[in-house]
């Protein structure tokens, strides 16, 4: 029987995958990534995003903001991943999730979209 923490992690990884699905992002939840990620590079993250030419690796983290819980070091979370999604417990302000990405992913995928949709300054 899985531990309470493992079950909670799986639940929130599933919720984040559902959110990505709702945005039209083609992604797959990695089964047993936490158990075997240190053994196989393809299991190093919680979710993979499939693009035409490559795969992006996404790590999911959940924190209850009402309890004092240690926030993971973002540098460590992104060390072997392309994107990190931090989900917080419900309640509080408007921010429910924070998406962080490494510089290469931002430059390759996000910056061109921002450039395409920019408002010209007069």
Put a short name on every predicted segment:
Residues 1-122:
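Catalytic phosphate/metal-binding cores of nucleic-acid and nucleotide-processing enzymes, i.e., regions
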